[in-house]
Structure formats: C-alpha cells, structure tokens
C-alpha cells in the first residue's frame, strides 16, 4: 500500500489578505460598522467538489482524505463525510478532531516526530500512523502494531520532477522530511526487525509534480 499527500505552493506572486478582493478592496458586506470579518462558504459548490472527489475514488480505487491542516472547519465535516474516506492529521489534536467529528471514517496521522507523552493517547484516535524516520519507527512502531494500527514510513525518493520550488520541495537534497534509501538501509542493517513493522510507504509531493 502507498500513501501520498500533496502540498500546494502559494500561486500568487504578491499575496493579498484573504478578506480582500483581487484589487485589494474590502467586501462592503463585511467591513461595515460592527460587522465581524468571516469566511463565506458556498455549500453547493463544496458538495460539487465533494462529488468530483468521490468520482475519482470510484474510478481509480484510491482513497481521498481531508487534510485538516489545510481545512479544519469541523462544522462542515458532515457535509464532506459522504464524499471522503477519512481525515489526515499532523498530530494528536487534529487526529482527535477527526475521530470526534467523523468517528466512522478512517483516521490517518503523520508527524515528523511524535511525543512519548502523547503517543498512547494518539493510539485511541488514529487508524494509520506514518513515521518520518527509522528511529521513530523503532521507538513507537511496536506499540502501534500491538494496538492494531496500520504502520507506514515516509520515504524521500530524492527525485524532483520540476524546478522553482526547491525551498519547500520535500524531495530536495538535505530535506529532513522522509527517509532516504541510504538511511533505511543503514537502519535496517542495525535493526533487521524494522521491515516487519511496516504495512506501507508514504511519500509526499508538490501538487504540480
């Protein structure tokens, strides 16, 4: 099994505040006296996007997760629930949010480094746990397997398919996100039982790749 996630670079050369329009003007309906700024969401369009994602899953057999780091408006989780396989979290509290708001859905979590004082609680929420390094896998993997969790390792394939985004390319040289082949080979030589802990691999790519 392979897990993949995407990160989208900022498309705008000159970022503007989210509550202004393309010309930098404040929407009149939001900037009057005593009117708080707020997000406006079109539920019909949100559902349409969900239908598109559901169609992709049905045609390909893949699973699409809600990346809570990018969108954690839990009031709308019930709207998205029919279209998505579950949630993706970057730590304990996002994983808990996904479990509380979408209890019947899959709960995936990846963190660059898990905390020992939080990991036992995390096991109450997460179904799939991805580790960033062989060290983290060796430290926490046995407990995750004993709890019946699906265990993965984030890998760095050390291969980029585009230029211009090196500063946040997780596959760039020197990236500390994911395990390189050399790092894995060295760790597996010292700990031959590491491969037995794994159910799959996770790789992260930019959305243009």
Regions found by a protein language model. Give the residues of each.
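An N-terminal domain-start capping segment
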Residues: 1, 57-59
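Alpha/beta catalytic barrel-like cores
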Residues: 1-34, 38-43, 47-49
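N-terminal glycine-rich anion-binding loops that anchor highly charged ligand groups
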Residues: 22-25, 52, 58, 64-65, ...
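Generic signal for short, ordered secondary-structure residues
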Residues: 24-25, 32, 59, 77, ...
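Short, flexible, solvent-exposed loop/turn segments with mixed acidic/basic and small polar residues
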Residues: 27, 54-56, 116-120
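A short alpha-helix capping/helix-coil boundary motif
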Residues: 30-34, 54-57, 72-76, 166-167
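Alpha-helical packing segments of well-folded alpha/beta enzyme cores
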Residues: 46-49, 53, 187
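Active-site-proximal beta-alpha core segment in soluble small-molecule metabolic enzymes
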Residues: 62-209
């Amino acid at each position: 099994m392979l897990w993949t996630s995407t990160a989208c670079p900022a498309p705008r050369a000159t970022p503007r505040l989210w509550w202004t329009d393309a010309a930098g003007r404040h929407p009149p309906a939001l900037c009057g006296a005593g009117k708080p700024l707020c997000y406006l969401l079109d539920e019909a369009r949100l559902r349409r996007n969900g239908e598109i994602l559901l169609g992709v899953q049905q045609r390909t057999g893949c699973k699409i997760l809600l990346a809570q780091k990018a969108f954690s408006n839990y009031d709308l989780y019930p709207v998205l629930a029919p279209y998505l396989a579950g949630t993706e979290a970057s730590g304990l509290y996002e994983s808990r949010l996904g479990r509380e708001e979408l209890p019947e859905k899959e709960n995936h979590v990846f963190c660059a480094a898990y905390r020992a004082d939080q990991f036992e609680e995390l096991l109450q929420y997460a179904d799939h746990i991805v580790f960033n390094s062989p060290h983290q896998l060796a430290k926490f993997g046995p407990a995750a397997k004993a709890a019946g969790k699906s265990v993965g390792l984030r890998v760095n394939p050390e291969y980029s398919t585009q230029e211009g985004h090196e500063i946040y390319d997780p596959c760039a040289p020197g990236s500390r996100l994911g395990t390189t082949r050399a790092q894995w080979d060295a760790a597996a030589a010292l700990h031959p039982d590491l491969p037995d802990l794994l159910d799959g691999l996770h790789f992260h790519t930019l959305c243009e790749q």
